[in-house]
């Protein structure tokens, strides 16, 4: 192994959780490194590019109050902002925005690059160096070694990821990335209990192929009513696009019921951290 650096904190994964963990540690003065499989997926939102909503919107504001990045990033990159549950009492009003996922990624990447005490590495972590019950460092797929005082695992769906498309299934992560299978095996070897959760993502539909006249338009709130997530956002905010609602029908129900008879093998119990 080649010794490549020494840090107080190493964060594995640069999604929502990893970004906030690395940023918080660095801002508190810890020499921090964040590792990601690819720099192009920092803050990537491959499934649903929205921030906030019921319960989750509360969490975004708490992160912002603690000096986090998600709220201000959402304010800077949103396409549509809408306060949910306006027909109910104010206690359940929930702010939700649809973001421009590419701009969100670029905003987050730039923010991390400007964070003092923080270094970004594009590398796959395959093994933890554990000595006498304590983590002393991490090892990359290319044999690089980084010593550290603690490690934050924030790998999300990359850890032991498996993709199911109909009856086909293969190892992989979101948006064509590969699964971090080596780290999964290493954590198992260290006695870490692992469990895999399952999610479903609908196929993307090309905008030009949609007949929007058949859908219900759902505009965002008027600009004068828009509220930011972040206490640090002071610029005027403007909605840019409408959203649309579609409904299922007996034909789509039949497709779902017919496909429900297809048996997919039991997923391996892997980790989602």
Positions of the model-derived regions?
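Beta1/beta-strand and adjacent pyrophosphate-binding region of the FAD-binding site
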Residues: 3-17
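Conserved N-terminal/central alpha/beta ligand/cofactor-binding core
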Residues: 4-6, 23-131, 142, 154-183, ...
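Conserved acidic residues
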Residues: 8, 136, 149
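Conserved phosphate-binding elements of NTP-dependent enzyme cores
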Residues: 11, 21-25, 135
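Acidic-residue sensor for enzyme active/binding pockets
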Residues: 20, 62, 266
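Residues within well-formed alpha-helices
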Residues: 20-24, 147, 270
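Core beta-strand elements of the Rossmann-like FAD/NAD(P) dinucleotide-binding domain
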Residues: 141-150
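Single conserved hydrophobic/aromatic residue that forms the stacking wall/gate
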Residues: 262-273
């Amino acid at each position: 192994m080649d010794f490549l650096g020494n840090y107080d904190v190493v964060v594995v994964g640069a999604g929502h959780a990893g970004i906030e963990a690395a940023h918080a540690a660095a801002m508190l003065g810890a020499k921090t490194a964040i590792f990601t499989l690819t720099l192009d997926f920092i803050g990537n939102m491959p499934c649903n590019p929205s921030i906030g909503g019921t319960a989750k919107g509360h969490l975004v504001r708490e992160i912002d109050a603690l000096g986090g990045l998600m709220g201000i990033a959402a304010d800077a990159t949103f396409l549509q902002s809408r306060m949910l549950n306006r027909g109910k009492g104010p206690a359940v009003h929930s702010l939700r925005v649809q973001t421009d996922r590419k701009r969100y990624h670029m905003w987050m990447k730039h923010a991390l690059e400007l964070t003092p005490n923080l270094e970004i590495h594009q590398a796959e972590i395959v093994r933890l160096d554990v000595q006498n019950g304590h983590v002393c460092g991490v090892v990359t797929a290319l044999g690089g070694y980084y010593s550290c005082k603690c490690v934050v695992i924030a790998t999300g769906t990359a850890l032991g990821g498996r993709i199911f498309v109909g009856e086909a299934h293969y190892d992989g992560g979101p948006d064509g990335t590969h699964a971090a299978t080596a780290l999964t095996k290493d954590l198992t070897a260290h006695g870490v209990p692992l469990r895999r959760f399952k999610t479903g993502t609908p196929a993307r539909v090309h905008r030009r192929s949609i007949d929007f006249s058949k859908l219900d338009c759902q505009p965002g709130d008027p600009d004068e009513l828009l509220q930011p997530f972040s206490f640090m956002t002071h610029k005027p905010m403007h909605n840019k696009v409408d959203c649309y609602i579609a409904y299922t029908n007996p034909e789509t129900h039949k497709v779902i019921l017919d496909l429900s008879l297809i048996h997919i093998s039991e997923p391996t119990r892997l980790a989602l951290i």
